[in-house]
Amino acid sequence: MSYANEEFEGSYDPYNYQADYDMHTGDPKQDLAYERQYEQQTYQVIPEVIKNFIQYFHKTVSDLIDQKVYELQASRVSSDVIDQKVYEIQDIYENSWTKLTERFFKNSPWPEAEAIAPQVGNDAVFLILYKELYYRHIYAKVSGGPTLEQRFESYYNYCNLFNYILNADGPAPLELPNQWLWDIIDEFIYQFQSFSQYRCKTAKKSEEEIEFLRSNPKIWNVHSVLNVLHSLVDKSNINRQLEVYTSGGDPESVAGEYGRHSLYKMLGYFSLVGLLRLHSLLGDYYQAIKVLENIELNKKSMYSRVPECQVTTYYYVGFAYLMMRRYQDAIRVFANILLYIQRTKSMFQRTTYKYEMINKQNEQMHGLLAIALTMYPMRIDESIHTQLREKYGDKMLRMQKGDAQIYEELFNYACPKFLSPVVPNYDNVHPNYHKEPYLQQLKVFLDEVQQQAQLSTIRSFLKLYTTMPVAKLAGFLDLPEQEFRIQLLVFKHKMKNLVWTSGISALEGEFQSASEVDFYIDKDMIHIADTKVARRYGDFFIRQIHKFEELNKTLKKMSQKP
């Protein structure tokens, strides 16, 4: 059921108030404070269409909770009635809320929870859910972003939400659409990331703000964030469910009291992806991939229903592989998800916020793929390769010539926003303190680039010959023979990667080389072999014929009368 669109079309303007005061004092800080106070006062007068929407939203959530309570008492996991209510909430969440936001609150906050509380009978659970949307909108759209108080209030609201879900005597009587559950975990980590960077920028903060931060070190503390994510994983028993699911068993058999319910199951799964993201932001790439050890990335599953979750998973796994020098795996991961985005892009354009997020990560992954392919050339899907040449052809050529500035530029654009888990010393914070986590990761990356600076040139020479005296090739490169031998050893070492071949864990693998050239040295001669595999068009056509035959059989079965 969609909230009636004609009710959006009223002529009410929430900003058009007649008032006999002047908002400009000449002092920017006073003006900003006065303006915010003014906005909060005006929202006490809530448009009728917003009142009606909130009452309808509350009734839908309340009806679902009542039905869930009944089914929990009857020892049922779910029903068609619950599914229908979840579908209605999804429509409100993805369509009605977005339309009303665009019309009434494009760059300003929704009414505060206290203002709408009488409309919903002070329903505590609904107000927690409403605040989650309220603060998320402030972070995303409101000019100037959240105040320090709003950052704290949003944290406490997430604490209330997760306490309600995790600390109940039994499963909480609540179900939400998968998209909203993913957005809750995604936003929770984003706000932690935002606060971690915010608290490090002390130059423009007042003494009062700094003292407030100093006296509240546990707010948005990394341990509390990790604790929430691990608690959701443990409560849902999701790792055991995934283990059984990937081995062909029934995950319900090991789900337990909580994990049988969609709320816990999906929050548990999304929390695994959240842990992947959080460990990547902290620079712990091994642990980032390890948390996904029961998720088989190379297969579709019943859990991969939210496109943004899929894209985020592949982005962070690919980036972690890149930083671990597992270039072949990074290239495979990026190429797979970019192909997926390319083929399903039209479905993301239905909602703007999804499209913006996926489009940004799509561009970032193209940049990371350009880096990986420059450092480890190998064959990828032709359509992705064509896109890459169009976007980064010139930059890839400059990177092949060892231009460290281009590497740094692309890394800066495409990497995640790293953060430090440590609360800063507020008595001595230098202006660039918030950049230190990024600069540390950049240094690690550029050190690796520097080690490989000569490899692209060596590779281009090796492709031209089958045998060549070591001294002669060293002369071509203007290198002393001993230094050239060291570079050849570096080439051998860097072109051999740990590569995932089979199994569930993304950390497993075998040492392989996918380099288009290989060589060995016999005394003072280099013997070179071109290992480039010619395109096998026959295999492609055979696969397409098999797919066509399977499709034909399926269509025939569908056309047969029962």
Swiss-Prot record:
Function, in words: Component of the eukaryotic translation initiation factor 3 (eIF-3) complex, which is involved in protein synthesis of a specialized repertoire of mRNAs and, together with other initiation factors, stimulates binding of mRNA and methionyl-tRNAi to the 40S ribosome. The eIF-3 complex specifically targets and initiates translation of a subset of mRNAs involved in cell proliferation.
Protein name: Eukaryotic translation initiation factor 3 subunit L
Domain of life: Eukaryota
Chief location bin: cytoplasm
Localization terms from the record: Cytoplasm
Any Gene Ontology CC annotation: eukaryotic 48S preinitiation complex
Keywords, comma-separated and alphabetical: Cytoplasm, Initiation factor, Protein biosynthesis
Keyword Cell inner membrane set for record: no
Subunit structure: Component of the eukaryotic translation initiation factor 3 (eIF-3) complex, which is composed of 13 subunits: eif3a, eif3b, eif3c, eif3d, eif3e, eif3f, eif3g, eif3h, eif3i, eif3j, eif3k, eif3l and eif3m.
GO biological process, one term: translational initiation
UniProt keyword annotation of Cytoplasm present: yes
Ranges for domain PCI: 329-535
One annotated GO molecular function: translation initiation factor activity
Family: Belongs to the eIF-3 subunit L family.
